Amino acid sequence: MSFLDSVLKAFVGDKSKKDVKEIQPIVNKIKALESEFEALSLDELRAKTSEFKAKIAEATKEVEDKIVALNKEADEIDDITRKEDIYAEVDALKEKSYEISEAVLNDILPEAFATVKETAKRFVNNTQLKVKASSFDREISAEKDYVTLEDDHAIWSNSWDAAGKPVTWDMVHYDVQLIGGVAMHQGKIAEMQTGEGKTLVATLPMYLNALTGNGVHLVTVNDYLAKRDSAWMAPIFQFHGMSVDCVDYHRPNSAARRKAYNADITYGTNNEFGFDYLRDNMSHAPDDLVQRPHNYAIVDEVDSVLVDDARTPLIISGPVPKGDTHEFMELKPAIANIVEVQRKHLVKVLSEAKKLIKEGDTKEGGFQLLRVYRGLPKNKALIKFLSEEGIKQLLQKTENHYMQDNNREMPKVDAELYFTIEEKSNQIDLTDKGIEFLSGKDEPDFFVMPEIGMEIAKIEKEGFPAEEEAEKKEELFRDYSVKSERIHTLRQLLKSYTLFEKDTEYVVIDNKVKIVDEQTGRIMEGRRYSDGLHQAIEAKENVKIEDATQTFATVTLQNYFRMYGKLSGMTGTAVTEAGELWEIYKLDVVEIPTNRPIARNDKEDLVYKTKREKYNAVIDHVTDLSNAGRPVLIGTTSVEISELLSRMLKLRNVPHNVLNAKRHKQEADIVAEAGNSGIVTIATNMAGRGTDIKLSKEVKEAGGLAIVGTERHDSRRVDRQLRGRAGRQGDPGSSQFYVSLEDNLMRLFGSERIAKLMDRMGLEEGEVIQHSMISKSIERAQKKVEENNFGVRKRLLEYDDVMNAQREVIYKRRYHALFGERLRVDLANMIFDISESITETNKAAEDFKNFEFELIRNFSMSSPVSEEEFKKMNAQKLAGEVYKSAYKHYDEKMSHNAERAFPVIKQVHEDERNNFERISVPFTDGTKTLSVVTNLEKAYETEGKQLIKDFEKNITLAIIDDAWKTHLRKMDELKQSVQLAVHEQKDPLLIYKFEAFELFKVMLENVNRDVMSFLFKGEIPSTGAPSIHEARQTKSKEKVETRKEEIPNMDERAAQSRAAGNTQRQQPEVTETIVRDRPKIGRNDKVTVKNVMSGESKTMKFKQAIPLLDKGDWVLVEE
């Protein structure tokens, strides 16, 4: 604890003690009820649940009844304004109902918690529990073997199978667990040390919040924990008639998964919850939805999910046109060559630098050393040399000298290099020498971007004929886009060769490149690096290069979890991230005291000069511990190190298991053995692992589990997770971290102070230092990294907040269209918006002719006012007249369509040979035709009105989805292009917000116009009955995939743009990929066009047709 912290504690008091003190009275109430609940029979105990539910129902009855009455009224009336008011009132009442039920939950909390605790006690004290059988008992006895029926009784066993592992219930909630349960119900994060039974604590708030019937989600980091915990805890809930399910057992979009979400309590992984939300917002029928509104979630390992995973958005993507065209394999040999040339050159430079420094020429030696560091920072010989006395300081001093005045002198250092590497920001740049080397003598301009502005001016000066000038400009733009893509490909290939190491950042399994999670050491199935980096690594490793994809739907985990009415979490390590959790999620962290004092011995770090010495010391220590009969858990940060230590232990004949990303399938078996005497387990990062390590009596006597950390992690929290695997529930144990000056953390973020300190102490090779001052310096370095990462996540969230606001608007509209109840209100608003837009633009220009034309184009109707009235009226009144007239016209049009369709529907319905459930009816607007599926029975009963409702729903959904996909692509491109704003000393985020708003406004206007245009013009073709046929139930599914993107941080993006700006400074433009939706037509090709108003057709050259097509009243007829 820092000095400042201890001073603050003395004056302000200890936050964790305050938090516990506030909760203690509630815990006392729960304990006071214990004797009363012990006296209850099993049936009386079970009746408590019905009693609680009745209390909630009674309290919310008045509000719920009002909601039902208002919805009924809205269905029966046609007045759009009244409908809108009703829906606003319904939304407000739903909020009120939620608040009332929350107040009731707070009142019944002591009794509800006492019920769960007493249930746990009964399961511990009885092998069988005999109760009067309910219908739920009968239902569950058919599925689960721990419930059997005997006459009209049900017998519950206290032993069952928890995801393949037999368990006998042996847990009752301690007082500290009750405190944790209360904190979680209040929407806070309970920090409980490992082994304090977080899984059991969660049963308390889950039972309480499930009483409302709105669903409770428990979110875990992996499917093993989701499946295990759901099976382990289920009987406690099921005994009280609550249904429990786990989404990871069922296929996406299936009826079984919908049933899992409809259960009272639902377990699952964060990814699946997020992907289901996205899939729901891509569905085309209400029956396809699986999730209910987001009510209450408890996130297990909350820091891992909300902090570590926050930089990785969930993405559903699909194929992009020409997604398989790239130049990775063509450019790969050149990159492999340039990397090798630079490596050979810098090896010589390094030996020259060593020689100069040895001779005392530190100026020139430092200069050469910096050059090597700029070109190959991960070179092993360089890292070893930097651990020698005074060398790290010399490098830092030289770097500071050349970095002053905004890197003014740095080009001197980089002059001999082909490319430079900024390891801290993961950034790489080609130098002029590198570009020259890659271009070769034959094509000097192979990588040089044309200066667009200058080139266009040149073309215009030449005075070419209009057609030729257009061709030349087209060619220039083509050349620009090919070269910018080529430079991007090149950069990503360079990055893959110099910054991404196999078996550290990724592994290759089954000829596929798979990312290793730096936090947990697990393989991230289905995740890909974005921005072409993954394809570059695939090219480097000679495996199949996957096609590029386009985003169809995306959400970050941060914004997904913020949708819940109430969010809480539990973890062993959140205090270090408490500031971030409060700032982003408004989640307070409550430290829960341990049930028994921690008996683990946490030793100060041992610091060595080189990695080699450090690993030798680790192996010596581990061998001694193993011989003493203690189990040892070695934590490593990469697959490569875990395999190196495994080889070293083999040479010493020490029996051991390795648990890393390559062996994740054997995880449960390895962890089960890890607590046995003398067993050594090597694991890559332990977040969420090792929860099942149990120690025998002999092991406890020998000193318990020994934790050996081979390196300090970037985050203090991950180190605490590793430490926490020992000393559970007051067991003995120890933890020891080994550090070397060559470790990444020390190299990148270790201060000059540590280097000076080591030199002052005269650390010789093989010697070790153990001092609290060193440990504090390491912690400071970790804090630096954490602050850096927090900045990145916060920046990312600010970008995503813009998307989130837009996503909410679009998904709300989609939801209304999907269910159709509020769609008429949305459509009326669309008509009003278009009316206002037409009126404002034409009134300002006093252009009555264009006003008439736009009304015909958008609403297929003539002007409701004369030219004289148009000139006299103000814009607001005129817009109102247009809206009234357009809405009346729309209403009549839809009634006419229903009347026209009904005779055919009647004929199909009354023909006894047809036993159709759903029929497909074609609608056309004169150019496009769309088949609308509707329920035949409902269409018949409503005299065709149901068909019109389905027509409105289908058109709105189809147009929104299409526009949203295109918009997402534009937003991706905008995010890339705004980074160039740094050249003009502007904040890219501000420009992004402004441009994104403009893009979204234009998209919404286009959606409104496209939807209304089709609805006003759309009608059933006059061919009649033959065009109506049975709708088959086959769903044509788009080929989509789900993945989590590893995205470069904003610093990287800005650095990339700065590099781009060095070659060319120009206005940041928003680039947009144009995707053709029709074949390319030559200017002199003959085409046929048709007038949508009169139906007249003409054949002419395409260049003559362009002005007509641009006006919008002529369309191209595809032959």
Swiss-Prot record:
Its EC number is 7.4.2.8. Residues 1059-1070 have a biased composition (Polar residues). ATP binds at residues 177, 195-199, 692. Pfam families: P-loop_SecA (PF21090), SecA_DEAD (PF07517), SecA_PP_bind (PF01043), SecA_SW (PF07516). This is Protein translocase subunit SecA. GO terms for biological process: intracellular protein transmembrane transport; protein import; protein targeting; protein transport by the Sec complex. InterPro entries: Helicase_ATP-bd, Helicase_C-like, P-loop_NTPase, SecA, SecA_CS, SecA_DEAD, SecA_motor_DEAD, SecA_preprotein_X-link_dom. Signal peptide: none annotated. Its main location: membrane. Belongs to the SecA family. Residues 1029-1055 have a biased composition (Basic and acidic residues). It is found in: Cell inner membrane; Cytoplasm. One of its GO terms (cellular component) is cytosol. Residues 1025-1081 are annotated as: Disordered. The keyword Ligase does not apply. The gene is secA. Keywords: ATP-binding, Cell inner membrane, Cell membrane, Cytoplasm, Membrane, Nucleotide-binding, Protein transport, Translocase, Translocation, Transport. It comes from Christiangramia forsetii (strain DSM 17595 / CGMCC 1.15422 / KT0803). Part of the Sec protein translocase complex. Interacts with the SecYEG preprotein conducting channel. Has a central role in coupling the hydrolysis of ATP to the transfer of proteins into and across the cell membrane, serving as an ATP-driven molecular motor driving the stepwise translocation of polypeptide chains across the membrane. It catalyses: ATP + H2O + cellular proteinSide 1 = ADP + phosphate + cellular proteinSide 2. It is a peripheral membrane protein. PANTHER family: CHLOROPLAST PROTEIN-TRANSPORTING ATPASE (PTHR30612:SF0), SECA INNER MEMBRANE COMPONENT OF SEC PROTEIN SECRETION SYSTEM (PTHR30612). Monomer and homodimer. Part of the essential Sec protein translocation apparatus which comprises SecA, SecYEG and auxiliary proteins SecDF. Other proteins may also be involved. The keyword Protein transport applies. GO terms for molecular function: ATP binding; protein-exporting ATPase activity. HAMAP family: SecA.
